[in-house]
Design a protein with these regions (language model features):
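Structural alpha/beta core scaffold segments of enzyme domains
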Residues: 1-373, 429, 463-464, 468-471, ...
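Short, surface-exposed secondary-structure junctions/capping segments
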Residues: 77-85, 384-390, 449, 454, ...
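N-terminal amphipathic, basic-rich helices that act as targeting or association modules
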Residues: 134, 141, 347, 352-415, ...
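A glycine-rich dinucleotide-binding beta-alpha-beta segment and adjacent secondary-structure elements
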Residues: 183-191, 413-432, 441
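Short small-residue beta-strand/loop micro-motif enriched in glycine and branched aliphatics
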Residues: 211-215, 377-382, 442-446
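Short, conserved aromatic-histidine micro-motifs
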Residues: 239-241, 479, 483-484
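Generic long, charged, amphipathic alpha-helical segments
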Residues: 244-246, 424-449
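C-terminal structured "cap/appendage" subdomains that terminate the fold
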Residues: 445-464
Length: 496
């Protein structure tokens, strides 16, 4: 996940193509080669200190993160530092990060790079302090949650954000009050990702039948085509099925950053809104000429150009279909194009609850119940949003319990196959319950926040906190494999 966002082996294809006189080149890698060479996320070791009063107010925090970037550097340590204390309003914070070089594959992007590791360290320690002080973990987070106007731990002030609403929805969910049995535990954790915008180009054009064609440069890997169509339809006030969204080839549109950083719906949606409004303005101008009135006296509503009040004249509204059918007579094709460097971020917060059962004889962790609560800003396509929530949670569960690169004494990867690198399957998982919280993003015309990455940050600490509650032993390293959990139960520590 994420390896597609960086140039890796493509230069070899270019070199081979040039050497062969411009012939096309196809490079095929085996599964083992992909796992060995294309780059995992960075491994990390972390030191965290947190000050908290007896009644649960955070006073200070300090982190030192060491992240292994592979042989060439480039670990997500800066992103980890941004995310570490982003959920909390602390009077004093201190961040130090190191990008460590090692004889390993270069680290690659992996869903919310750096955030899951930071969340594991910080949220585990907050939970440990809450346990020592007999404080409710959600109440403590509510006391310290960042809100509009607070300065983030990494500098900028937050605009409207939904962490408090997310925590309240989590506390009110039935999962937080379900009774637990012996060897069972419940863990809570928050997570953050900053969803950037970036360089974006889109084109919008009107067809003769009144339908709208949208061309974007962000490949659809998580439902963005549908959400962009919905935002386009809402901008024009036309049915969803009147919009067609096309993904352009690289050379067919202006520059676009890849689909990464939870930016597709956030950035392309904002650009489509601007391009669509260009065409709406043009349609209003043409209708104004037809009515022989000032363009300012025409406004757009629900797919129609209408006179702006009785003083503009007694004219019947003209539909987008009629305007489109007359384009050849009123000035030719109607199209809009918008290129933008979209600054600012969406600030997405999530809170997860995990209930687990630990087998004291084998150390196996079974996830009994799992809840994802996240602020989506505005959920343009709710079922796709829920899918992103669930996908992030499942990836995080795999990271917390199973997934690990195992290197031998010779420095070679020992488990370069899915038989040995074990990802979660359906039988490993409960139903992932979701709650969509909607606190609109003030920097987006539809209130959108990117939702693709935040969901992978809370599972690591939520499960670690649940295992600690079930076993009364705190594990400080991942994954929490059966062997590691069993050792911790027997010795009282995982050795970290």
């Amino acid at each position: 996940f994420g390896g597609k966002t960086t140039i890796f082996i493509e230069p070899l294809a270019l070199a081979l193509s040039k050497k062969s006189g411009g012939r096309p080149v196809k490079i095929v890698m085996s599964r083992a080669e992909v796992l060995r060479a294309t780059g995992p996320t960075a491994s990390a070791s972390m030191d965290v200190k947190i000050g908290m009063t007896k009644d649960g107010y955070l006073t200070s925090g300090s982190v030192e993160f060491r992240m292994q970037g592979g042989a060439f550097g480039g670990s997500p340590v800066s992103e980890a530092l941004q995310c570490a204390f982003a959920s909390y309003n602390m009077p004093a914070v201190h961040h130090i990060g190191y990008d460590i070089l090692a004889n390993r594959p270069r680290a690659a992007a992996y869903r919310a790079p750096g955030s899951p590791m930071a969340a594991f360290a910080v949220e585990s320690l907050i939970d440990e302090i809450c346990t020592d002080l007999s404080l409710d973990p959600i109440d403590v987070r509510l006391k310290n949650a960042v809100k509009e106007g607070d300065k983030s731990s990494y500098g900028p002030k937050f605009k409207k954000i939904g962490l408090i609403e997310t925590l309240e929805a989590t506390k009110n969910h039935p999962n937080y009050s379900v009774s637990l049995e012996v060897n069972q535990g419940r863990g809570v954790a928050a997570g953050y990702w900053m969803n950037h915008g970036g360089e974006t180009s889109v084109s919008v054009s009107l067809a003769e039948d009144g339908s709208v064609n949208v061309t974007v440069g962000t490949p659809d890997i998580g439902g963005s085509r549908a959400s962009i169509a919905l935002m386009t339809a809402e901008t024009y006030g036309i049915p969803y099925d009147s919009v067609s969204v096309n993904i352009a080839e690289t050379g067919a549109l202006g520059f676009n950053e890849p689909t990464h950083g939870s930016r597709a719906t956030l950035a392309s949606g904002k650009a489509v809104y601007e391009a669509a409004n260009q065409t709406i303005s043009e349609m209003c101008r043409r209708v104004a000429r037809k009515w022989q009135i000032d363009p300012d006296a025409v406004f757009w509503e629900d797919g129609y150009a209408k006179p702006a009040g009785p003083n503009a004249g007694d004219f019947s509204p003209i539909s987008i279909k009629q305007i489109a059918s007359e384009m050849d007579k009123t000035g030719g094709p109607i199209a809009g194009h918008h290129e933008a460097s979209i600054r600012g971020v969406g600030h997405s917060f999530g809170v997860h609850i995990a209930d687990v059962e630990v087998d004291p004889e084998t150390g196996r962790v079974t996830v009994l119940r799992y809840l994802v609560v996240q602020d989506a800003g505005r959920a343009i396509h709710p079922s796709y949003v829920e899918g992103q929530f669930q996908g992030g949670a499942v990836q995080g569960i795999g990271w917390a319990l199973n997934e690990e690169y195992v290197y031998g004494a010779d420095g070679c990867l020992q488990n370069a196959a899915f038989l040995d690198y074990r990802i979660p399957v359906a039988s490993d998982l409960p139903n992932i319950d979701t709650i969509i919280v909607e606190v609109p993003n003030p920097d987006h015309p539809f209130g959108v926040r990117g939702v693709g990455e935040t969901g992978i940050a809370p599972p690591l600490p939520a499960l670690a906190n649940a295992v600690a509650a079930a076993t009364k032993v705190r594990l400080r390293s991942l994954p929490m494999s059966p062997a590691k959990v069993l050792k911790a139960i027997k010795t009282g520590s995982d050795g970290c």
